[in-house]
A protein has these predicted regions:
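Outer-membrane beta-barrel biogenesis signature
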Residues: 22-70, 80-83
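Residues that define the transmembrane beta-barrel architecture of outer-membrane proteins
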Residues: 64-66, 88-92, 118-122, 135, ...
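Transmembrane beta-strands of outer-membrane beta-barrel proteins
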Residues: 68-72, 94, 103-107, 124, ...
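Transmembrane beta-strands of outer-membrane beta-barrel pores
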Residues: 74-80, 100-102, 109-113, 130, ...
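Detector for outer-membrane/organellar transmembrane beta-barrel domains
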Residues: 157-237, 259-262
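Outer-membrane beta-barrel "beta-signal"
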Residues: 200, 248-253, 279-285, 294-311
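Solvent-exposed loop segments that connect transmembrane elements
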Residues: 226-235, 266-294
Length: 311
């Protein structure tokens, strides 16, 4: 039971949305903002500090010129697809991305509090961004590493993701995407994630100079295959997550206020996350949760994030 709890933990790390709300709003390939405005990205549910999310191709860049961007920030909680990766405590992170034409590669690091006790979450990404017609496409591959885990545990894994963003008019944007991992969190289970989101940008003519305001929201659905026999052989619980919030931007700085929630029961939340602080008293499932342990790691949360983005 203890081993299953430790190994199912980083399911919390599956991937596709924003600090770009990650920097500060999610690690993944599902986020779009107005050019240069990472804070207004539509979050589709990715890991929180990766430059992969919310970094569309910037107009005016030379096709064959190597360029770099940097992001960093702090948040009152690190929420990933409705579940906390920081035990509902503050978190910090940073990322660097290099682009050359349509190609990009990057690295992000974030503080986490997970059952396997890694020293940090490290994300390595590579991919390509192209615009076809009026749709921005982003395809990328990510590797999520958790160094310093408890001896005998290993939750590192790969993921591929694709997202599309489209601006409807001056104020409305939409985004959608998918992510797939053949062995999520090294549990032996495959995972799929599908998400969509919308954004509303307050026109600049109604705002002071250098100020931006964006309202964004989205929802996603995660489903999984069976874990390895050593971990019980049963599928992890499928679930919905959703979020909505507002991002205020001043030059290179962002302030994001966001509400997150899921439809997971407290019992299924424990099965998914392996929360080491789970409490007894829940409904017993003799296959997935024979002790009836419950977790609040998937409950509703209101998160404040402050970040910067340098291009």
């Amino acid at each position: 039971m203890v081993e299953r709890r430790l190994r199912s933990v980083a399911i919390l790390a599956i991937a596709v949305a924003a600090v770009g709300p990650v920097f500060i709003a999610d690690h993944s390939a599902l986020g779009q903002a107005a050019p240069g405005n990472y804070g207004g990205a539509i979050s589709l549910g990715g890991h929180g500090w990766s430059s992969f999310e919310g970094a569309p191709a910037t107009p005016g860049r030379e096709a064959n010129q190597l360029e770099f961007s940097f992001r960093g920030g702090v948040a009152t909680d690190y929420i990933y697809r409705g579940t906390t990766l920081s035990d509902h405590k503050p978190a910090a992170g940073g990322a660097i991305e290099a682009t050359f034409g349509a190609l990009y590669a990057g690295f992000a690091i974030a503080s986490v509090r997970l059952p396997t006790q890694p020293t940090a979450e490290m994300t390595f990404i590579a991919g390509a961004r192209r615009t076809i017609g009026d749709v921005d496409l982003d395809f990328g591959v990510s590797y999520f590493a958790y160094p310093g885990e408890i001896s005998g545990t290993d939750t590192d894994y790969w993921q591929a993701a694709i997202r599309a963003d489209k601006r409807i008019n001056e104020v409305f944007r939409v985004a959608g995407g998918f992510a797939y991992s053949p062995n999520v969190s090294n549990t032996g289970a495959w995972s799929w994630y599908a998400a969509g989101g919308v954004g509303f940008d307050v026109p600049s003519r109604f705002l002071p100079a250098d100020i931006g305001v964006s309202f964004t929201g989205g929802a996603g659905y995660s489903w999984f295959g069976n874990q390895s026999p050593e971990l019980g052989g049963f599928p992890l619980p499928a679930y919905w997550n959703w979020q909505a919030g507002v991002t205020l931007t001043y030059k290179v700085f962002n302030l994001d206020l966001r509400y997150y929630d899921t439809n997971l029961s407290k019992e299924d939340c424990f099965v998914l996350t392996g929360d080491p602080n789970a409490r007894p008293g829940g409904a017993i499932n003799f296959i997935t949760n024979p002790e009836g342990l419950t977790s609040r790691w998937c409950s509703a949360a209101l998160v404040a994030k402050v970040s910067f983005a340098l291009n």
